[in-house]
Amino acid sequence: MAEARRLPPPLPPRLDWFVHTQADLLAQSGIPEWFHGTISREAAENMLESQPLGTFLIRVSHSHVGYTLSYKAQTCCRHFMVKLSEDGTCAFAGDHMTHASLHALVTFHQQKPIRPFGELLTQACGQEDPANVDYEDLFLYSNALVQDAESQILRTEVQRSSCPPEEASERKPSTTTKGEFASASCSPKALFEDSGQKLWKNLRSLPQTSQRVKQRLTSHLLAMNLLGDARQVAQQHHSPVTRAFSWDSTSHSEDSCAATTSLQNPAEPQALRGREATFRDSRPASWRKAFSGVKAWRGKVVRALSAQEPVDFPEAQGWLPEEYLPPPPFAPGY
């Protein structure tokens, strides 16, 4: 607060450019005699009125970022706007000739006349009261800003040197805290990079995923082919197989009846066994061959289906490539 109170009243915003960019340049080799700070146009004319022709001064402009050159002409005082460019050069408004500094501009027009009037600059107009210069407020504020910045730097260095090592270690945040802050303040760019890395991993895993899906589809197609072969065999021997199945059902029904009878009459099982053997022997050889072929194909189908992994269609859908899934929320136009 003490340093803030020592600062002079702040300058108008239109003069900030001079304090921050021009004050040090003008003061490097001494403030020139022709510089007069922020005096008004009327004050400049009053100072030049009693001076000889060609007497000039340069003042800080109130209307633009730059200066104003005022000099004594034959019948009046003339005023020229001096524009400053971003690279530090200066020139009269509307003139194509640029100069490296105000000193260079003044030196040039002391030798070359100012167009279109053809008048030369002759001598500089000094201060009316050298003990009370009119640019004091500009450089006072600039010096105060420099001193305030230096005192803040010095104060920071003193605090760092006087801080004990224990307190410094306590004040030093841990790596986990830094990680938490970093994760909490994650920017959209970081999120986009993470999403891009995930997408790249999914793209790299596409060959393995497609290979797994291909293997499952191949196994299921093999099982379907076995079923189709079994149906073809059944169609080739349709009539005998049907009759054999009907005979088997008849024999099964007879066997069940025989079992019921045997429970009621235990003396008949031997007769039933003999009748069943006679019935099997009376079957045609072609029927027995067809029936055994169907049973063989049925065993192959059962073994093929039992050897394959169970199908889990939701899981297979989960292995689909990324371009077939709904777009993520950060996708353009989503």
UniProtKB/Swiss-Prot annotation:
Biological process annotations from GO: negative regulation of B cell apoptotic process; negative regulation of mitochondrial depolarization; signal transduction; T cell activation
Mitochondrion is among the record's keywords: yes
Name this polypeptide is given: Hematopoietic SH2 domain-containing protein
Domain (SH2): residue spans on this chain: 34-125
Matching InterPro entries: HSH2D_SH2, SH2, SH2_dom_sf
Organism lineage: Eukaryota, Metazoa, Chordata, Craniata, Vertebrata
Highest taxon of the lineage: Eukaryota
Subunit structure: Interacts with FES and TNK2.
Protein location: Cytoplasm; Mitochondrion
Function: Adapter protein involved in tyrosine kinase and CD28 signaling. May be a modulator of the apoptotic response through its ability to affect mitochondrial stability.
SUPFAM superfamilies hit by this protein: SH2 domain
Chief place of localization: cytoplasm
Location of region: Disordered: 157-181, 254-280
Compositional bias of kind Polar residues: 258-267
GO cellular component, as recorded: cytosol; mitochondrion
Keywords, in A-Z order: Cytoplasm, Mitochondrion, Phosphoprotein, SH2 domain
Pfam families (alphabetical): SH2
Source organism: Mus musculus (Mouse)
Tissue note: Predominantly expressed in spleen and thymus. Appears not to be expressed in heart, brain, liver, kidney, embryo, lung and ovary.
GO molecular function terms listed in the Swiss-Prot or TrEMBL record: protein-macromolecule adaptor activity
PTM entry text: May be phosphorylated by FES and ACK1.
